[in-house]
Amino acid sequence: MDADALSADVSAAASADVGGPPARVVTSADGTLIGVFTTGQGPPLVLVHGAAADHTTFRVVGPRLAQRYTVHAIDRRGRGDSGDTLPYAIEREFEDVAAVAEAVRDADTSGVPVIGHSYGGRCALGAALLTDAISAVVCYEGAPTPPGVEYGDAALADELTALDEAGRPADLLEAFVRRVVGMDDAGIAAYRADPVWPRRVAAAHTIPRELLAEGRSGAAGLDALARVGQPVLQVLGGDSKPEFGEATAALDDRLANGTIVVIPGARHAAHHTHPDALIEAIDTFLAGA
């Protein structure tokens, strides 16, 4: 998530109704409860958010998608209205998304497209290996890092873990947005003053474990995803960091039924900054999936 992305996330989440309960709670394979927030009418689809966020990050695109879909936005485990079970493994997140898709499929008796942003896209792809309830996947810059491409900063992951273990979640979140997102002092001050800050602090402990899990995935994650048989649309921001493009291309090379769409001018948060272009890509893809 870059600085523009996080700024947009703050604004979107602050304007969202963060006090309402989930429409349903789904039990995952390990017993963890996953909160699902549902709006709209029409064919079902599931939204899966990325790191340092919750379901409110889809405040901009969610209502627009809900004009023609029944939108089921989840809180991933460890935050918001979802539970958590240790030890953490990214595979449990795959199971969470699969469980939600199966619950929605049971209610609507149809296949369910899953749309995931960043780490949420990785979770959506992994879930597609577990269930035929997922009919298609839209992944926004969530492909595993290919061999030879450095993912993040291992020292930073250790530093964030130490802050978590020291019981300093606010400092953890600030370190993440400063060093990974690139937010400056003024941006951090505004973020801390925003109503969404406590929600993000409460979920800050999930950041280092996700950085570590993604960093360890690498080539093994890419090779496993070669078995995904559902149609997969990967969406890439035209102005995103080069490593996102490299990961997207590496995954597309392995997929049997993959497509790439590039949104000109977008970076890592087109769901905030270029919602119309993103929704157009989703609609076009799902019409042919």
What does each of the following model-derived ranges do?
Residues 1-45, 68, 287-289:
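Alpha/beta-hydrolase fold catalytic core
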Residues 199-253, 262:
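Conserved serine/cysteine hydrolase catalytic core
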Residues 125-165:
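Flexible "cap/lid" loop of the alpha/beta hydrolase fold
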Residues 75-79, 143, 266-267:
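Short beta-to-alpha linker loops that shape the active-site pocket of alpha/beta-hydrolase fold enzymes
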